[in-house]
């Protein structure tokens, strides 16, 4: 009896080995709910004009020239502002509720590094304040009159106008109001 059990077990092992093993009786693995062949396939090219939304204009874009032109403040990429444009900018900062302040710099009107070489540290961020901030000012012409006084007192200085938000305690806008004639 033991020999017949042994031969039946040996026969079962031999049959299982020849017919693909134990996996012959198992269910096929799960491959997903739908066949991939039923979905449409689109092929994308690696052409730059298909990626850029402005098409052929990509090649005509230029950056700020690094030689001979210094970047000072907001709007420094524009030509010098006229008196009417300055009035409009000052009116904008007054409409926002910001306090106008006038500053000037005689030597280095742009950000530079001199005293320290660590990243993020730059000299030239702080200019000399012209008088006090103009608290309560509501007339942009009054701000431009102060700019004219600063020009007369320091004709070789760069002069900028700052809009300061006293609620958030931050400087919100800063732009050059006057550059000397021989400036770079």
Curated annotation (Swiss-Prot):
This is Ribulose bisphosphate carboxylase small subunit, chloroplastic 2. One of its GO terms (cellular component) is chloroplast. Its main location: plastid. Residues 1-59 form a transit peptide. Heterohexadecamer of 8 large and 8 small subunits. Keywords: Calvin cycle, Carbon dioxide fixation, Chloroplast, Photorespiration, Photosynthesis, Plastid, Transit peptide. GO terms for molecular function: ribulose-bisphosphate carboxylase activity. SUPFAM superfamilies: RuBisCO, small subunit. The basic functional RuBisCO is composed of a large chain homodimer in a 'head-to-tail' conformation. In form I RuBisCO this homodimer is arranged in a barrel-like tetramer with the small subunits forming a tetrameric 'cap' on each end of the 'barrel'. The keyword Protein biosynthesis does not apply. InterPro entries: RuBisCO_ssu, RuBisCO_ssu_dom, RuBisCO_ssu_N, RuBisCO_ssu_sf. RuBisCO catalyzes two reactions: the carboxylation of D-ribulose 1,5-bisphosphate, the primary event in carbon dioxide fixation, as well as the oxidative fragmentation of the pentose substrate. Both reactions occur simultaneously and in competition at the same active site. Although the small subunit is not catalytic it is essential for maximal activity. One of its GO terms (biological process) is photorespiration. Belongs to the RuBisCO small chain family. It is found in: Plastid, Chloroplast. The keyword Nucleus does not apply.
